[in-house]
Amino acid sequence: FNNYDDGLFKLHNILQENHIKFAFMGPTGAYLRCPYMEQNIITAYVNELPYEMGKLFPVEKDGNVVLYVPQSERFFLGQQEIRNLPVVSDIQLYLDLIKMPGRNEDQAEYLRENILHWG
């Protein structure tokens, strides 16, 4: 990718061309909804893995695109559109972030304070 945003739109196009239901989640969704820190890995929920991924290819580790196939369609409930990109609900973003390693807990707290307004 030329930059992170370029990667978002390229992945968006690949998934749409393959008729894959998806929504950006975790750090990527938070980057779009309530940016707090730089991101370098694109994360999304997909209802299935696409057969054709263009210039993307699977790797064992250290990839820059991570696709999750959730156990339930509930992960897509409340999906929102930001900059013409699908993003999971704010609550789902928060739940994703608090379960992820690294500084994602900081991002979750920032999202909670600025968007969710919980106690």
Spans of features found by a protein language model:
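Short gly/ser-rich loop at a beta-strand->alpha-helix junction or flexible surface loop bordering the NTP-binding
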Residues: 1-71
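C-terminal regulatory/effector modules of DNA-binding transcriptional regulators
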Residues: 51, 55-119
